[in-house]
Amino acid sequence: ELKRLIRELNANGIECILDVVFNHTAEGNELGPCFSFKGFDNNIYYMLTPEGFYYNFSGCGNVLNCNHPVVRRFITDCLRHWAVEYRVDGFRFDLASILGRDQNGAPMENPPILEALAFDSILGDMKLIAEAWDAGGLYQVGSFPSWNRWAEWNGRYRDDMRSFLKGDSGVAGRAITRITGSSDMYDPA
């Protein structure tokens, strides 16, 4: 049914962007249940502190180790499946800044997973949209590693326009800034 829905949407000029979450799982922290990745190889799939606790840049108790080759392959295979089998037009990545952290949680200059997705032969024409921040304080709006392929989800646009449309006072100036390209966040060049 979903494949048919996407075909019909596309036939009517509507693109389908799939919201994906590759930053955490439902397994929680070290006290959480073992559904899948903890059982496969906890040390590969999750970012762990030297003491064996889970980093929590997602606010959900754990963080996937997205730049490990095994996890990188898993993410790429999942996205390729949705692109080939379902023909989605792109992906919006929840808390995408997590995908730019190394196994110790440090931000990387050229994260392998983000670069791999940007240049993947199957995903090459797909829209890639990053929610360019995470719950650990890494805020990359305006500076997300993109290789001229990644777009950024503008959360301030969402928040300011919502306030404006609700009729909140004092937000007209912010709404104008958002409508005209968020020059306070992005280099106009």
Which functions belong to the PLM regions below?
Residues 1-87, 92-119, 138, 185:
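Substrate-binding/active-site clefts of carbohydrate-active enzymes
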Residues 87, 103-104, 108-189:
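Conserved alpha/beta catalytic core and glycan-binding cleft of carbohydrate-active enzymes
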